[in-house]
């Protein structure tokens, strides 16, 4: 059985994967660190402070690792996994997520892009497009153990941050941050 746990950075994926894999007795795979260890990247993006994944190599490595295993996979790249029995998308209130990423010391552009992705449901949309049936869980203000129980009971949420006016305002300010970086790059 393959269970994918995905969501924007800061949504709690690693913690949930650790708890869920232990509870089920499954192996776990933290995709980003696995790909870095196996040098499945093409370059390092200084501006975004992250590796650019070599998707073909990554897909092959992951497919080989998960073959014939019961595994819980933590990833922000759901399309790198060939198949899954269950896909869980962790969603977190963008205002809370913004604070969490800032606390981690992330750069302004990286925070803006990731919080905007959460508001717009980018990872959720990608997972839905790739796998069809997904389960979104709003993890905001929930203990990790509560989230694991919600996953096991298949109790999904319907998350739409764009219905909240304050979040619409946040989206506009994030867009300005991203645009200012894009403008500075095009000026070079």
Swiss-Prot record:
InterPro entries: Adenyl_kinase_AK6, P-loop_NTPase. Residues 30-53 are annotated as: NMP. Residues 103-113 are annotated as: LID. It catalyses: AMP + ATP = 2 ADP; ATP + H2O = ADP + phosphate + H(+). Pfam families: AAA_18. Keywords: ATP-binding, Kinase, Nucleotide-binding, Ribosome biogenesis, rRNA processing, Transferase. PANTHER family: ADENYLATE KINASE ISOENZYME 6, POS9-ACTIVATING FACTOR FAP7-RELATED. Broad-specificity nucleoside monophosphate (NMP) kinase that catalyzes the reversible transfer of the terminal phosphate group between nucleoside triphosphates and monophosphates. Also has ATPase activity. Involved in the late maturation steps of the 30S ribosomal particles, specifically 16S rRNA maturation. While NMP activity is not required for ribosome maturation, ATPase activity is. Associates transiently with small ribosomal subunit protein uS11. ATP hydrolysis breaks the interaction with uS11. Belongs to the adenylate kinase family. AK6 subfamily. This is Putative adenylate kinase. GO terms for biological process: ribosomal small subunit biogenesis; rRNA processing. One of its GO terms (molecular function) is ATP binding. ATP binds at residues 10, 12-15, 104, 142. Interacts with uS11. Not a structural component of 40S pre-ribosomes, but transiently interacts with them by binding to uS11. Its EC number is 2.7.4.3. It is an enzyme of class 2 (transferase).
